Amino acid sequence: MDDSSSLASPVQSILAAARRRDPPTRRCTVSARSLPAALHSAAADGRTPIIAEVKPTSPTTDTEHSGDPAELAREMVAGGAAAVSVLTEPHHFDGSTDALRAIRDAVDVPVLRKDFLLTEPQLDAVAADAVLLIARFLGDDLGDMLAAARDRGFQALVEVHSPRELARAVDADADIIGVNNRDLTALTVDLDTFGAVAPEAPADVTLVAESGIATPTDARTMRAAGADGLLVGSAIMDGPVRDTTRRLVTA
């Protein structure tokens, strides 16, 4: 299924924990708010289309963030975020499905569930407007997972890091693709990754730049390289949430 042999140790630990999670017993169905439409609307209004992420902590940082998740999300939207991403991975990111439920009730923008989903039943843990599917982890199962997500009403943001993974995502009929600037082998970030991968995507695919976007200059660089949306977590969580979101939105 997944290609994990060369992944960084923290990533291997995340995947091992994901495999051990008990699957939900009830199927989830969703009437989703459109993520591509929200990104397009933000751009049409002259805003940089930001997907702001509620991320309590991460294996790549020593920082921990407290605070009510729903209030954080409201602050992000007040700062102009087009959508909100929510970590639901409990063991390494301190995320929860309860936080996502509260956030989706609190805001009227699309909410992305960011987690490490390896099997179809894991899709059923919580209703969200979109789910993250990581091409490298799913391997040959990507197409089946994408179809299963859509069958439940989810949109899927398919994450890639290389032209090869992009080709697999396109072959699986992904229509929202995120290019992760973070190399999951070394956990290093290179903002040039997006510019190297994105030009190979079909014109009708919604492209999202992920990881390492910290400043208005970074945001402008990603937009100039073709990003339809920018997923930003740590840079927003590490500062005054509303003000930091607004600085990126107005880049």
Curated annotation (Swiss-Prot):
Pfam families: IGPS. It catalyses: 1-(2-carboxyphenylamino)-1-deoxy-D-ribulose 5-phosphate + H(+) = (1S,2R)-1-C-(indol-3-yl)glycerol 3-phosphate + CO2 + H2O. The keyword Lyase applies. GO terms for biological process: L-tryptophan biosynthetic process. Keywords: Amino-acid biosynthesis, Aromatic amino acid biosynthesis, Decarboxylase, Lyase, Tryptophan biosynthesis. Its EC number is 4.1.1.48. One of its GO terms (molecular function) is indole-3-glycerol-phosphate synthase activity. Residues 1-12 have a biased composition (Polar residues). Residues 1-27 are annotated as: Disordered. Pathway: Amino-acid biosynthesis; L-tryptophan biosynthesis; L-tryptophan from chorismate: step 4/5. Belongs to the TrpC family. This is Indole-3-glycerol phosphate synthase. It comes from Halobacterium salinarum (strain ATCC 700922 / JCM 11081 / NRC-1) (Halobacterium halobium). The gene is trpC.
